[in-house]
Curated annotation (Swiss-Prot):
This is Large ribosomal subunit protein bL32. One of its GO terms (molecular function) is structural constituent of ribosome. Residues 1-22 have a biased composition (Basic residues). SUPFAM superfamilies: Zn-binding ribosomal proteins. The lineage of its organism: Bacteria, Pseudomonadati, Pseudomonadota, Alphaproteobacteria, Rhodospirillales. GO terms for cellular component: large ribosomal subunit. Pfam families: Ribosomal_L32p. Keywords: Ribonucleoprotein, Ribosomal protein.
Length: 60
């Protein structure tokens, strides 16, 4: 079984884990209705994506 030759210092351990943090979700404004929506997703409020209506009656 593989065993480390040297002890990993707290500094090196923490530097390795520096990329493990959760990142916040990115949101943008829908150009059609102005509601917040995820990038590259259909707007949940009006059903528009890329300048055209994709979903009929999204909120109604």
């Amino acid at each position: 079984m593989a065993v480390p030759k040297k002890k990993t210092s707290k500094s090196r351990r923490d530097m390795r884990r520096s990329h493990h943090a959760l990142k916040g979700s990115a949101y943008g404004e829908c150009p059609n209705c102005g509601e917040l929506k995820r990038p590259h997703h259909v707007c949940g409020s009006c059903g528009h994506y890329d300048g055209r209506e994709v979903v009929q009656n999204a909120s109604a």
